Amino acid sequence: MSDDVVVQPEPADHANQSVPTYSWYALSVLVLVYTLNFIDRQILSILANDIKQDLGVDDAYLGFLYGTAFAIFYALFGIPLGKLADSWKRVRLMTLGLSLWSAMTAFSGFARDAGTLTVARIGVGVGEATASPSAYSLISDWFPARIRATALAIYSSGIYIGGGISLAIGGVIVDNWNQAFP
């Protein structure tokens, strides 16, 4: 006798069940949220020269802003927020996170000094830390094992969609900003 766990395959009738339309709709909303998440993360790299000029900061500060100010707080809060996603309402948690990072992104636009921009980017990191733990858990609930990897891959496409869109949006912002404030 062994203590190995035997995994039973899904019954044939369960394996052939279609995924509810709501699951696909919800996945598309999650992809949109993840896309916005990465637009927000990447757009600062396009705006770097203008931020340096407007706030009088150097490359070291921008490195701190992109790395430490955002990433440390994203990582620090990701673990407890992931645990909270396991025990609380995941959609509500993601909504609160999206609200926080959206507010902090808007607050970034009003920053008149490096300290204010740093606080805003920390807030963005904390808010964005709610997204993936909540999304992975929700996707696991909404999609059966036979299609879950596909659903997760679709969700992950938001990284690349957001990264690409951020370049276009950032370029438009820089052009318009420089025309308005030569």
Predicted regions and their residues:
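Membrane-interface helix termini in secondary transporters
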Residues: D50, I79-K83, V172
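Extracellular/periplasmic helix-loop-helix junction of adjacent transmembrane segments
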Residues: L47-L76
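Residue-level signature of mid-helix packing/kink "hotspots" within the transmembrane helices
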Residues: Q42, F70-I79, A129, G163-G164
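Helix-breaking motifs and short loop linkers at transmembrane-helix boundaries and internal kinks
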Residues: G56, K89, F110-T116, G127, ...
